[in-house]
Amino acid sequence: MEDGKKMKILYEDNHIIVVIKECNIPVQEDISKDKDMLTIIKEYIKEKYNKPGNVYLGLVHRLDRPVGGVMVFARTSKAASRLSEQIRDKKIEKRYIALTHNHTKKHEILIDKLSKDEKTNTSYVSDSGKESILEYMKSSCEGAYSSP
């Protein structure tokens, strides 16, 4: 499968599939119509298990298009419900690792209100937006790079 090169499967069973999403691939279809993770994984499941018709795949969390990382998809509606509940109850924690060209402070918390421009599919700071909290801690510093 040609698009299978866009993902690496870390874990798979009858209930979930855990993959690495590469940078610059949308999680779901957007205005660009570029191939997205949901479609890629559905095609993979359909081909691997010789499934006729539509394949169920539950999207329980997202990563922004520019971001790469580990994603968990539900293969059943029951798994989707349970994963969504765990996320809602904060039993699942998201962690991001970033590499920056600039040195960062040792520890900082940034709080902003973000709104989304649907036409450009971008977010911006706005008084009427949804609260967004970013907390980071610098873990190392190597030459010109810093890893918060």
Identify the function of each model-found stretch.
Residues 1-148:
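RNA pseudouridine synthases
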